[in-house]
């Protein structure tokens, strides 16, 4: 089980709401979110209800300002607890849609896709084991996309507007 507390104001001030599991609509509990305290588990926060919009992956820790989780606004409208995963991590990325063309398999974090894959565009991927977070820019910057195990036949299936992929990492929970 996880525990996350949302605060309307920066530095853990103002009205707060404590959550211990997935919530598709947080609007009834707070009008804005400027800071977050993750006490246990890892979480994906979404800017819109029903797990839509920009995504933000947060591990255990304190985030006194939404910019600390690379947020672009104080809007958080839904959240998911990342299931605990014990075991290996494996993901394959492909240069073409439908898991075709050049393929490369990863089992570790990758701070620069271009350095390993020699391309900046990834049009499809297959998450074989574990949960992963993709980033638009190198060094885990830019828009984030949380991926569960499964086949993503085109970049739009993981929520991306373009096929540009800069980096990715395993969604590993802190001990």
From Swiss-Prot:
Monomer. SUPFAM superfamilies: gamma-Crystallin-like. The keyword Repeat applies. The gene is CRYGB. InterPro entries: Beta/Gamma-Crystallin, Beta/gamma_crystallin, G_crystallin-like. Disulfide bonds: none annotated. Has a two-domain beta-structure, folded into four very similar Greek key motifs. One of its GO terms (biological process) is lens development in camera-type eye. Residues 84-88 are annotated as: Connecting peptide. Crystallins are the dominant structural components of the vertebrate eye lens. This is Gamma-crystallin B. GO terms for molecular function: structural constituent of eye lens. The keyword Plastid does not apply. PANTHER family: BETA/GAMMA CRYSTALLIN, GAMMA-CRYSTALLIN D. Belongs to the beta/gamma-crystallin family. Keywords: Eye lens protein, Repeat. It holds the Pfam family Crystall. Residues 2-40, 41-83, 89-129, 130-172 form the Beta/gamma crystallin 'Greek key' domain.
């Amino acid at each position: 089980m996880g525990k996350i507390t949302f605060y309307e104001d920066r530095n853990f001030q103002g009205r707060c709401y404590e959550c211990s599991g997935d919530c598709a609509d947080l609007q009834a509990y707070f009008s804005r979110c400027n800071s977050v305290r993750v006490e246990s588990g890892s979480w994906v926060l979404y800017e819109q209800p029903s797990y839509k919009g920009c995504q933000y992956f947060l591990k255990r820790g304190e985030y006194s300002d939404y910019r600390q989780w690379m947020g672009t606004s104080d809007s958080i409208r839904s959240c998911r607890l990342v299931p605990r995963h014990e075991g290996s991590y494996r993901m394959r990325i492909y240069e073409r849609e439908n898991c075709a063309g050049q393929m490369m398999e990863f089992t570790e974090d990758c701070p620069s896709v271009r350095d390993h894959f020699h391309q900046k565009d990834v049009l499809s991927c297959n998450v074989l084991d574990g949960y992963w977070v993709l980033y638009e820019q190198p060094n885990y910057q830019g828009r984030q996309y949380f991926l569960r195990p499964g086949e993503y036949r085109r970049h739009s299936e993981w929520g991306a507007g373009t096929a540009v992929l800069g980096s990715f990492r395993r969604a590993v929970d802190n001990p």
